Amino acid sequence: MALSRVCWARSAVWGSAVTPGHFVTRRLQLGRSGLAWGAPRSSKLHLSPKADVKNLMSYVVTKTKAINGKYHRFLGRHFPRFYVLYTIFMKGLQMLWADAKKARRIKTNMWKHNIKFHQLPYREMEHLRQFRQDVTKCLFLGIISIPPFANYLVFLLMYLFPRQLLIRHFWTPKQQTDFLDIYHAFRKQSHPEIISYLEKVIPLISDAGLRWRLTDLCTKIQRGTHPAIHDILALRECFSNHPLGMNQLQALHVKALSRAMLLTSYLPPPLLRHRLKTHTTVIHQLDKALAKLGIGQLTAQEVKSACYLRGLNSTHIGEDRCRTWLGEWLQISCSLKEAELSLLLHNVVLLSTNYLGTRR
């Protein structure tokens, strides 16, 4: 009995201290307080993945721009000459990348709509032609940079030989003027040689009137006179068949014409002849597209580039004079048929040699 009373007393004491109701209430309070501070954590963990990626990318871009700005300021203060070259190189890469995207867009449009090259507008035709030429020049750098550690040698060669290895995007404004003058000096060296070849074939022309006209034209050019359009067009028959047709030109004559077009002359004569045909055909197609567009629609830079491509050193000639010369060229080019393209090829020499101050 005593033992049972003791047990009953202990249970009474513990029961009064911790009642079931108080225990349940305490558990509920803990659960509610846990929900109260745990809800925001669960909301943060369930943010949209797209928002997280967007915020991360924005942060990375901001930090990259800040670091890039500090790097540019450091180069500008401590290495000013290198900074100029670095800036030109980076801008050149951006322009080349923009050209590549535009060329791809044009090619995609041609493929979708089954458009041929000669059916394109003038600016798109010229862009593809120039981009193809730039890629061909860059291809050499890509090949020589393939061996391990050769890229260091490539950078050195690019610095030492910018005219030979780099395209126009990576030239300074002064380099552009100087290099264009150098290239024009190269092609002008072949002008007297081409005129002498024309004089040599005069006895082979059967028509006496054509012989006299060609002799008179060569004499005018040698004396420094700029020929008239009708003087050149009068010789169309001469350049459509023997001895001045594209397929009848002598090997040395073809090499001289290749140099006048700034094409390599160190290829077998059949390949040189094929390249000249292709190059002249492209220029003829460009001329037709330009005549349709109108010279007045071109910017000053586009006019000068078009004149330089066709043999005129436009870097030292005013815009109005360049437009006048380009109009003369188009008048001759658009009057020629495909069989008479040899005359258009020789027109690079005939029409540009004595125009204004180009004879030096």
UniProtKB/Swiss-Prot annotation:
Residues 1-137 are cytoplasmic. Residues 1-110 are annotated as: Required and sufficient for mitochondrial import. Keywords: Membrane, Mitochondrion, Mitochondrion inner membrane, Mitochondrion outer membrane, Nucleus, Proto-oncogene, Transmembrane, Transmembrane helix. Residues 159-360 are mitochondrial intermembrane. The keyword NADP does not apply. It is a single-pass membrane protein. This is LETM1 domain-containing protein 1. Plays an essential role for mitochondrial structure and function, as well as thermogenesis of brown adipocytes. In brown adipose tissue also localizes in the nucleus where it interacts with the chromatin remodeler SMARCA4 to regulate thermogenic genes expression, such as UCP1. May regulate phagocytosis and inflammatory responses to lipopolysaccharide in macrophages. Involved in tumorigenesis and may function as a negative regulator of the p53/TP53. GO terms for cellular component: mitochondrial inner membrane; mitochondrial outer membrane; mitochondrion; nucleolus; nucleoplasm; nucleus. It is found in: Mitochondrion outer membrane; Nucleus; Mitochondrion inner membrane. Kidney, liver, skeletal muscle, heart and brain. Overexpressed in various tumors including leukemia, lymphoma, and carcinomas of the breast, kidney, ovary, stomach, colon and uterine cervix. The chain crosses the membrane at residues 138-158. It comes from the Eukaryota. Pfam families: LETM1_RBD. Residues 186-360 form the Letm1 RBD domain. GO terms for molecular function: molecular adaptor activity; ribosome binding. Interacts with BRI3BP. Interacts (via C-terminal) with SMARCA4; the interaction regulates transcriptional expression of thermogenic genes in brown adipose tissue. It comes from Homo sapiens. One of its GO terms (biological process) is phagocytosis.
